[in-house]
Amino acid sequence: MIKIAPSILSANFAAMGEAVEKLKAQGADWVHFDVMDGNFVPNITFGPDMCKALRPLTDLPIDVHLMVEHPSEWIEPFKKAGADILTVHVESAEHHLHRALQSIHAAGMKAGVVLNPATPIGACVHLLPECDLVLLMSVNPGFGGQSFIPETLRKIRALRSEIDARGCDTLIEIDGGVNPETAKRCIEAGANVLVAGSAVFKAPDPAEMIRALRG
């Protein structure tokens, strides 16, 4: 079943708790939590304290996307904050990605890697045995509300082939410019999880939008 992970980066920050509380009833599967440090990407968002504050408000998995230079420094803080999934960028300053993924698993969380639009899937195939998921960025990271990059579809198909060839259970997650039209194309290409921010939180009826994204 296709999972939908609304990105709270696009929620009303003044009513964040209320928005998160509503997500399960609206049909969401995960809560996507974007962490930006102002260095790896040109924006600053949330940290472990926000995750900790939101944790009691939902039993949905919290999917933390670390857009930071040194992701290993944040494994323990996000474990303590109640995160369920932690993904790290292959483009970060993390020189020991295998070790980082193993540390995330040792902390009791699911682990994955993230690829920016310009990064080929070859950068992550050797990591697939350690990955519960691979997040493919379909926009350049840093800000919400961007348009989907069509080349992502080719990357999804190629990554799906690599995963299947290795007999892995790794999920493919897509983040950026996801709407009902692009969602359908991503699912057809082999995606399992769709991150949607503006599409969900700006919709007149978020529950209906989540149903439309799932297809």
Q: Where are the model-predicted features located?
A:
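Short, electropositive alpha-helical surface patch
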Residues: D84-E91, I187-A196
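A short, acidic/glycine-rich surface segment
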Residues: T119-A123
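Conserved N-terminal beta1-alpha1 strand-loop-helix module at the mouth
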Residues: M1-T87, S92-R99, H105-A111, C124-C131, ...
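Short glycine-rich anion-binding loops that position phosphate/pyrophosphate groups of nucleotides
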Residues: V139-P141
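Acidic, divalent-metal-coordinating active-site segment for phosphoryl/phosphodiester hydrolysis
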Residues: G177-A189
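Short basic/hydrophobic patches in alpha-helices and adjacent helix-turn junctions
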Residues: A158-E162, R185-E188
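Glycine-rich beta-strand-to-loop/alpha-helix junction loops that act as flexible
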Residues: I174-G177, V195-A199
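Short gly/ser/thr-rich secondary-structure transition/capping motifs
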Residues: V114-A118
